Swiss-Prot record:
Tissue expression profile of the protein: Expressed by the venom gland.
UniProt domain comment: Has the structural arrangement of an alpha-helix connected to a beta-sheet by disulfide bonds (CSalpha/beta).
Cross-referenced InterPro entries: Scorpion_toxin-like_sf (IPR036574), Toxin_alpha-KTx_8/9 (IPR008911)
Propeptide span(s): 22-30
Natural source organism: Buthus israelis (Israeli scorpion)
Signal peptide extent: 1-21
UniProt-annotated location(s): Secreted
Entry's Gene Ontology molecular function annotations: ion channel inhibitor activity; potassium channel regulator activity; toxin activity
Protein family (similarity comment): Belongs to the short scorpion toxin superfamily. Potassium channel inhibitor family. Alpha-KTx 09 subfamily.
The name this protein goes by in its record: Potassium channel toxin alpha-KTx 9.9
First-listed, main subcellular location of the protein, grouped into a coarse class: secreted
Keywords: Disulfide bond, Ion channel impairing toxin, Neurotoxin, Potassium channel impairing toxin, Secreted, Signal, Toxin
Length: 58
């Protein structure tokens, strides 16, 4: 019985990791103004900030 509980825990952790990976995808990610230049670096971008949301303007 103990193994199934451990298995469930592992599944939950994996699911959380997948969710975090999806959420932290750059397309979805809302980057603050101060991180905007770093976030857009190397993308031939002109970073602008609108309503606290970073936009790379690639």
């Amino acid at each position: 019985k103990k193994t199934s509980r451990l298995f469930t825990l592992v599944l939950i952790v994996l699911a959380m990791n997948v969710m975090m990976a999806i959420i932290s995808d750059p397309v979805v990610e809302a980057v603050g103004c101060e991180e905007c230049p770093m976030h857009c670096k190397g993308k031939m971008a002109k970073p602008t900030c609108y309503d606290g949301v970073c936009n790379c303007n690639v």
